[in-house]
Amino acid sequence: MRLIDPDADLEFDPDSVYDGPSKSQKKREVEALQDLGNELVKLPDAQFKRIELPEELREAVAACRKITQNSALRRQRQYIGKLMRGIDPAPIQAQLDAFKGVSATENAKLHQAEKWRDRLIADNEALTIFLDSYPETDATRLRQLIRNARDEAARNKPPKAFREIFRVIREAMQAG
């Protein structure tokens, strides 16, 4: 048995010990790629057709979208993760982020249109404010729709004018 001499001058170089990322770090990276693959699987058809993917990955994602059995779905998602490790995920993530940004913007516009519709029906002065903001809107038609919507609400009729006001507001917001 060799004994270590405590008086010996041992040099410790911390750079020579580093073997790369830890096992846990590698697992986190693999899981992140699988999550990115899951986002691809959950994309609506129109967005999935527009996203640029390597052919093998596109086929694997398309197959995963058709699978309903849990164990097969899990295996296919792991396979997608394996394919993702062989490519650069940054462009795919950028495209997904762009889709999400568009969706968030569209949602915000729809919420704003809903708020305008509710304000217009509840408050007569809101019409003046709306027409100042969107002067190209047909004021006569909008006034008539507001009257009809109030009448429909009072009589518990289907909200036909209510929906039409929303369409008019959305068109005005897109034009302006």
From Swiss-Prot:
Coiled-coil regions listed: none
Keywords in alphabetical order: Cytoplasm, Ribosome biogenesis, RNA-binding, rRNA-binding
CDD domains referenced in this protein's UniProt entry, alphabetically: YjgA-like
Compositionally biased tracts (Acidic residues): 1-16
Cellular component per GO, a single term: cytosol
InterPro entries: DarP, DarP_sf
Annotated stretches, region: Disordered: 1-29
GO molecular function annotations of the record: ribosome binding; rRNA binding
One Pfam family it belongs to: DarP
Ranges that cross the membrane: none
Major subcellular site: cytoplasm
Family designation: Belongs to the DarP family.
NCBIfam families reported for this sequence: PRK05255.1-1
Protein name listed in UniProt: Dual-action ribosomal maturation protein DarP
Lineage: Bacteria, Pseudomonadati, Pseudomonadota, Betaproteobacteria, Nitrosomonadales
